[in-house]
Structures are given as C-alpha cells and as structure tokens.
Amino acid sequence: MGVRDAGWLMLFAETNQEAYDNYLQAMRIAEAVSLPIMVCQDGFITSHAIENIDLVETEKVKEFVGEYKPAHALLKPGEPMAVGAYATPVYYMEAKRQQAQAMMDAKDVIRKVGKEFGEMTGRTYGLIETYMMDDAEEAIVIIGSSAGTAKEAINELRAQGKN
C-alpha cells in the first residue's frame, strides 16, 4: 500500500501464468500512457510455487511488445540527463492532474492490449474479474493469489446453498 497513490499502474496476478502474461502486456500499457507500471505477484505463494505456464513464442512476444523507442532515455551515452524532484511547487498540481488523466486513459489501453493479447494467446483478464456474482448476496474484493482461495471458499459455500 506504500505506493497506492504514487501514480503507478499496478497489475495483480492470481497465478504464475497471469504474472507472466501481465509482464508481456505491461510494456505496451506503460508506454502507451507514459506511466510506470508494476506487475505485482505474491512474495511467497506464487513466487515459491512450482506451476506450469504456457510461454508465448519469442517471435510473437517481440511482435506483440514491439521495439522500445524511449522519447527520453535516462541512460543515453552522449546525452546525459539528471532527474530530480517530481515537480516544483508551481507545476506540481498540473503534473498530478496529467498523471490522473493518464491513469484514466489507461483503462481503455488495458482493454485494448488485453484484447490483442487474448487474440494471440487465448487468455484474457480484463480490468476486474468477477466470480459467481449474478445472484450473490455478499462479495469479497481481493487481489493476488488469495483470489484462488476465495474462489474455492465460494464454491464450498455455494455447495451448501449459500449465496
């Protein structure tokens, strides 16, 4: 939660497959909206688990991600650049407004990139996943690998006739 309001996009993975897929999509999303992006994966449950994943062929990945052509590269020989404070007080609010707008614009970009990724791999995720919500009386909001545990709990409760 320490970076919740930092202005970075965050993609959370339930499984190792989803983490891998998020990494591939993250490049395109971040570059399209000019915001940093984090692919978040549980620090023990998925990171220490052995799980098969379906890899995308290298050539398909290169084609999907594209060539990286930064407008302002920090490490460019012959053209040094320094990075200081986020913004001076005079420009801070305008910079934060632009950051907030980029965050809103990211929703459409995530949908578009996700659709293209789904066409390439058959795997789609969307912005938010719902599970058995059509007639639910209660809901859980959860991120990461705990979502799998929550789905199992929902299955058990449904088997007992609870909504």
Describe the residue ranges of each PLM region.
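Conserved thiamine diphosphate
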Residues: M1-G43, E67-Y68
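Short glycine-rich or small-residue beta-strand-to-loop segments that form or flank ligand, phosphate
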Residues: L9-E14, E137-I143
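Gly/Ser/Thr-rich loops at beta-strand to alpha-helix junctions
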Residues: N16-Q17, F44-T46, I143-T149
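A short secondary-structure junction signal
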Residues: D21-L24, A49-N52, K151-I154
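Structural beta-strand/beta-sheet cores of well-ordered domains, especially the beta-sheet scaffolds
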Residues: L35-I37, E79, A136-V141, K162
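Conformationally flexible catalytic loops at phosphate/diphosphate-handling active centers
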Residues: I37-E129
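Glycine-/acidic-rich phosphate or pyrophosphate-binding loops and their flanking alpha/beta elements
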Residues: E116-A139, K151, N155
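Short helix-loop-beta junction
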Residues: A153-N163
